[in-house]
Amino acid sequence: MRRALHLLALAALVVTVSARAPVAEGATPAVDVPGPGSTVRVDAAAGEFENGSVIVRGVSGHLAVRLGAGSAPLLQDALSVLRLTDTQVAGRAIGDPLPPLTQRATVTGHRPVTLVLRFRVPDATPPGIYAGRLDFSRNGHGFARVPVRLRVFGVQMPARDDPTAFRTLFLIQPQTYLAAVLTGSGIEPQSGGPGIVDRLYAFLSEYRVSPGDWGFGTPWPEGYVDRTGWFRAAATRMAAEGAYPFTAMRLPLGTQRSPASRTGQSARTPETWTAYLTGQVLPFWRDHDWLDRALVWGWDEPGPVYGRQYAAPQACAAHAAGVAYLTTGAPAQRIPARRVTIPWGQGTRSFTIRAHGTGNGFLWDDRGCDDVDIWAVLSRRVYGSFATPVEHRSHIDVQRELRPAIDTARARGASIWSFTYESKAGLGSPGYAATEPATDARVFGLWNALEGMDGTLYADGMVSYGGLDPYKRLTQHGQHVLIYPALASTDEPVSSLRLENLRDGIEDADLARLVVARRGRPALLAILARQRIFSIRGNRVLLGCTSGCDLVTKTKYAWPRYRHGAGTNAALERVHSALLKALAPVPA
């Protein structure tokens, strides 16, 4: 099972494993294993990361965990032990950074310590049960032994560069990450810079997160040439960064919100794009076999006016170069005015419901060169919204009125993705803020699979530290930081509790899509309904909003109720196991 979650959720389901020996200070240390039994149990597919967790209590001093003698070699190679630590977010301490235990081994006081046990299961791992034992010690003296069992199913995760898998695109600023690591380690950029950046992109690839920025690999006006200095060597840096497998490869053209680029290109002058792409960019990408995953993201939420002025000519420019075009926004049609008659006292009364919505059918009419290939739709705008009293009494169903346009664009060949940003109170769908339950990120991945999304985009950043030490404090609600700086210049980036859930959500989305492809959507609905992940009745997803939806909730936009309280992590683990069981026999 996968475990990576908040201390309160973990503490709700624990079984204490008795200590082997008392500690010198007189306290009796113990290791709690969430869930039934005293064994850490992890279910996984080949090519997947999976987490277990334990809570260590009653320990002060130097804490160490290692695999005991006789443990399966796969476990020896795959295990990383991470320690959940706190940072300040919106005025309170929140458990989020996950540095390696070896670099945060000193435990002070008697506060419980949550450890995340991260297993990386290699591709093509044979199905079976891989058993071992975790030995816990304090100041070199053992105090507990805990069995561990990794159960690998006969399921292979999609390749990390498979464009038919669940795709991702996350904005990230490698320059900001590099500066943070250099500040913490005190080394000079010229001696450690390339390695630090390479480890960042390798880490993103392992976690199935495709970068929305290539940083030092961004080409110059003359293309991929190496200028003086490693950070100006565009060809060398892009070859290194792009060598890691990603499902999506964003071409170096920004949106209207992007800072000035060293390419010299602008989102407002798409008439120069085709020549730049075909002459300076695509030959390099073709030589590296990246074109099957290439896309242009050129405008953020254009609306009908900017859609005609910018998104449409951008799409034509991308298509003239032979690459896909993405925009954030939704296929939309204007809802015409309607005259309705409703019961009123002893008689009836007529009302006019005004026309509303903005149409952008010219971007998905299957005519001309300007159709959008990939729509990244804000999750809260996938269905519809609340009904007014007149609409409600007229039996007009507005909770799903946005879906027909999306479904039509999909039927005409468009790929539909999702995107999200900070989920403020009442907006009605999960996001990646540190002030939300960490499980929201994983639930969001399952929702994407449930609604047939082909990918997801995130534009709030992953390493935007705002000049702060992220180990001490995050800006706003933490939504701009999903990765923490490596604690040593030669280390990989430090994960977060939210990023572990995000990665799990991406992997679950891939597994869920496989279940739908092989067994149909009802099979996925049944798995999710059994664990109450979403409001599902029969084969129908029930939506909630303030008025006129299937359910009454506090949200303006229609969205299913989703699980986010105590017990959510355990329920998600059961969903993960059920997905694996739906795809392959249980290993013996």
Question: What label would you give each PLM region?
Answer:
Residues 22-37, 49, 59-117:
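Surface-exposed binding patches on compact interaction domains or structured appendages
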